[in-house]
Amino acid sequence: MQRQGTVRAPCSRIVDPHQKVNYTVCGWIITIISYLVVLFTLPLSAFFCLKVVQEYERAVIFRLGRLKHGGARGPGIFFIIPCIESFKKIDLRVVSFDVPPQEILSKDSVTVSVDAVIYFRISNATVSVINVEDAARSTKLLAQTTLRNFLGTRTLAEMLSSRDAISMQMQAALDEATDPWGVKVERVEIKDVRLPIQLQRAMAAEAEAARAAGAKIIAAEGEQLASRALADAADVIATSPCAIQLRYLQTLNSISSEKNNTIIFPFPTELIAKFIQSAAA
C-alpha cells in the first residue's frame, strides 16, 4: 500500500474565549480608573470607545494584554476602553492564492513543475490571532510543503490522470494541519503539471507511433475482410452460371454510367465461363 505524505502544523495551545480572566489588584485598579475617565469625558470619549466591524469581519479584543472574555465581537458596534483595551480585525472571507511552481521529483524519477491554487478562510478569529502570527502567510508556506510531499509519492501517470483525487487528499491534509490556526481550507486545485521539453517530445513520438501502429492494424484487418469477401464471391460465381451473367451486366452498367464516351463491345458470357472453368481446372 502506498504511503501518503503528511504535513503537521506546529502544536498550538488551546484557547477558550469564554474562560474568565483573573486580573491582579493593579489590573483591577487600572480598569476602574479607565472606566471613570471614560464616564467623566462623555460624550467625547464615545468617539474613541465605539467601534464598528463589517458583516464579514470579527474583532478580537485584548484587555491589559490578555484575551477579553466572550470571544470575538461582531458584526456591528462594540465598545472598548482605549486606555486598557486593544483589538484586531479579522477578515472571514475566502482568500485565494497561487502556489509558486514547485520542482518535484516524482516516484518514477521524473522532474516536473507543478503549480496550484488554494482557497481558504479564517474559521476561528480568536484562534487565528492567538496561535499564529500571520495565518495567511503560514498557510501559504504550508501549502507549498504539502504539495511537494504529496506529489513526491506519486508517479507521473498518477499526476496526469488523478488530479482531482490528489487535490481532494491535499485539501483534507492541509485542512487538518491548519485547524490549530483557526484556518479552514475550502479547496485545492492543481493548475498545471509541466513536463521537461525532452520528455514531451518523447511522449509525442510514442503517441504518434501508437497511432500509426493502430492504423496499420485496422488496414490489415480491412484487407483481410475484403479478401474473404472476394473469395466468397468467387465461390458463388463459380457455382452459379446466373451469377456470372448478373455480374457481367452490373459491370457494363457501371462502366456506361461513369464513362459515357467509351464504346463497349459485349463479350459472350459463355466464353467467360469457359475461361473461368479452365482456370479453376
UniProtKB/Swiss-Prot annotation:
The gene is sto-4. Disulfide bonds: none annotated. Keywords: Membrane, Transmembrane, Transmembrane helix. The chain crosses the membrane at residues 28-48. The keyword Calcium does not apply. It is found in: Membrane. SMART domains: PHB. Belongs to the band 7/mec-2 family. This is Stomatin-4.
